[in-house]
Amino acid sequence: MKAHFGVTVWLGVCCSMTLLMVVIGGITRLTHSGLSITEWQPIVGVVPPIGDEAWLREKEKYAQTPEYRHRAADISLDDFKRIYIIEYIHRLFGRALGAVFCLPIPYFAITKRIDRAMVAKLLIVALLGGMQGAMGWFMVKSGLVDTPRVSHYRLAGHLFLTILLFSILWHSFLRCAGVRSTTTTTNARFFTAAAVVGLTVLQMVLGALVAGLDAGLTYNTFPLMDGAIIPQSLFSAKLWHGGFLHDVTAVQFLHRLVAVLIVVCAAPLPFWLKTRGAWLFLACVALQFLLGVATLVSVVHIFLAAMHQVFGFVTLAAGVHMLCRLRREGSTCISGHAGIS
């Protein structure tokens, strides 16, 4: 069945907005703006402070946070406005993305431009979007209590929900756009390719742990860490008794290790699968690796770090596209328009 052009465009817009949201979220984190708004008001919060009195009230709320006491006690009102506006844009864009995604679903369903299976799939995405927003606030709350930073575990959870949401959206878009499973490959090679894409997801989550711990601000050389491939501190007995994912050295080393593993595993895929999608995925993996190294040696330059974060999603998108093109031996070809009427 022919995909409805409007549905395809809508899904493409939602995917693009999700990537832009990732960029905005990265900039929010890198500029330490995320804790500047201390309340979660999904409806009232659409309107920003108006007038100096309103701004001073918001700054007074910020003054009660650990971040203010430890890092920003001398912040001026103008500087506070700057970080507040960044977080405000982050939240406002999230609301806009939710509206752009959710509002057309009833129309497309009633006019039978999408079938029940696709409606169910899209409702799962909507649920993930709501969970992602709630997780964002749950993450922010962790930085408003004792420490002047959010929990790196909650940050990783926040990103992981975005990964799930984007993956389903992107897969739906590819099917609507007519991408078919036309290249036959062995089960072993298919599952190897899928495992490399899975490693990419794991690496993105590890990147969130690195970001949450500010681990990128240390060991700013590559490939050595403190003059060695494997730093001596990794052999500490204390590290292996429950503190591994809390340790800056361990988390950064793990992020480096998985990055190299992905490059090594992705390198043979184009020769095994013989598809342009595999070459595109390998190119994205290589560029993402170089962006990661550049971010590290630049001591987390904001532009490089933001590009590194969003290009992780581009690499994931290339991986999902690669898998969509593959058909395992013995399976039937998957139509590029499943779920569309």
From Swiss-Prot:
Pathway annotation from the record: Porphyrin-containing compound metabolism; heme A biosynthesis; heme A from heme O: step 1/1
Function: Catalyzes the conversion of heme O to heme A by two successive hydroxylations of the methyl group at C8. The first hydroxylation forms heme I, the second hydroxylation results in an unstable dihydroxymethyl group, which spontaneously dehydrates, resulting in the formyl group of heme A.
Compartments reported by the entry: Cell membrane
Taxonomic lineage of the native organism: Bacteria, Pseudomonadati, Pseudomonadota, Alphaproteobacteria, Rickettsiales
Assigned keywords, A-Z: Cell membrane, Heme biosynthesis, Iron, Membrane, Metal-binding, Oxidoreductase, Transmembrane, Transmembrane helix
Bilayer topology annotation: Multi-pass membrane protein
Top EC class for this record: oxidoreductase
Cofactor annotation: heme b
Biological processes per GO annotation: heme A biosynthetic process
Catalytic activity: Fe(II)-heme o + 2 A + H2O = Fe(II)-heme a + 2 AH2
Main location: membrane
Name of the gene this protein is made from: ctaA
Pfam families named among the record's database cross-references: COX15-CtaA (PF02628)
Ranges that cross the membrane: 7-27, 92-112, 118-138, 159-179, 190-210, 253-273, 280-300, 302-322
GO molecular function terms noted in the UniProt entry: metal ion binding; oxidoreductase activity, acting on NAD(P)H, heme protein as acceptor
Protein name: Heme A synthase
Family stated for the protein in its record: Belongs to the COX15/CtaA family. Type 2 subfamily.
Domain of life of the source: Bacteria
